[in-house]
């Protein structure tokens, strides 16, 4: 078990715990502010943040590809903080499990999981009810996932910020759900537990052979300049294909399934009951086919 080092924890505590900060929260969580801050991360001056960030959070750059600047020192190879933020793994650094009865992790992230969404399912950090209708913004697809399994993958600013398709299949539908840009780290969730259903998000409805239909929901967060889609959704996707990435800021991917089709892995379910997230590498087992 590890204790998380939170990037910008002082600012987040001020915004969500301080009465004056709470007055400013709606402004800070607005799309223009997040986009403006995201633009700053594209400027060349922002590259100066990379070395101290790497040192503070003990990031092992040997497992990542270098940036676009030719230099012997990898931490100086990124032309901006955003280029560093969306760094890619070296080839073959992560592999996706091949067993068709096991779902691989679609993000390198911290996971919560529930066997089924119902009136008793709450976010462990502060008892906020979750349901498919709210998560999907009242979409026509909401009923497809009622009573089905749920995975929440939370990405921290220190993490790999590209997200992938867990399984081969096709996209049936995709749509944007407008909202705000609150932080998704634990400090913010404790103060404002409804963040997952008020933040801006993008949903894709996927059809897979082994695990049925999936709702793949990317949740925007404070200071996320953009959520970039990398795959042409009119074409088929394969297990492990990159779906997209988040520019600067921690964020979250939520996965919903059809009732009885699959269940989160036992360790995730057990840890979730105790309010503990399970950290997984990209491609590790995250769920099993069938009802367990």
Report residues per predicted region.
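Contiguous, well-folded functional domains in the mature portion of proteins
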Residues: 1-292
């Amino acid at each position: 078990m590890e204790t998380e080092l939170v990037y910008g924890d002082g600012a987040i505590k001020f915004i969500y715990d301080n009465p004056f900060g709470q007055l400013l929260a709606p402004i800070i969580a607005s799309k223009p502010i997040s986009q403006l801050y995201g633009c700053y991360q594209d400027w060349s001056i922002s590259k100066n943040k990379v070395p101290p960030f790497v040192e503070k959070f003990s990031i092992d750059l040997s497992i990542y590809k270098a940036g676009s600047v030719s230099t012997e020192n990898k931490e100086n190879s990124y032309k901006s903080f955003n280029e560093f933020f969306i760094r890619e793994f070296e080839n073959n650094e992560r592999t996706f499990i091949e067993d068709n009865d096991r779902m691989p992790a679609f993000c390198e992230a911290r996971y919560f999981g529930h066997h089924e969404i119902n009136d008793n399912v709450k976010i462990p950090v502060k008892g906020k009810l979750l349901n498919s209708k709210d998560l999907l913004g009242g979409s026509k697809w909401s009923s497809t996932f009622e009573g089905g399994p749920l995975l929440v993958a939370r990405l921290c600013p220190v993490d790999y910020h590209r997200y992938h398709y867990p399984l081969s299949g096709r996209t049936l539908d995709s749509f944007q759900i407008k909202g705000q840009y609150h932080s998704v780290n634990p400090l913010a969730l404790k103060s404002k537990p409804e963040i997952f259903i008020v933040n801006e998000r993008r949903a894709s409805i996927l059809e897979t052979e082994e695990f049925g239909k999936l709702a793949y929901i990317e949740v925007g967060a404070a200071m996320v300049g953009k959520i970039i889609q990398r795959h042409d959704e009119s074409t088929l996707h394969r297990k492990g294909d990159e779906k997209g990435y988040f520019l600067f800021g921690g964020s979250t991917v939520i996965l919903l399934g059809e009732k009885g089709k699959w269940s989160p892995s036992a360790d995730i379910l057990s840890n979730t009951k105790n309010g503990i997230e399970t950290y997984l590498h990209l491609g590790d087992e995250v769920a099993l086919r069938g009802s367990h």
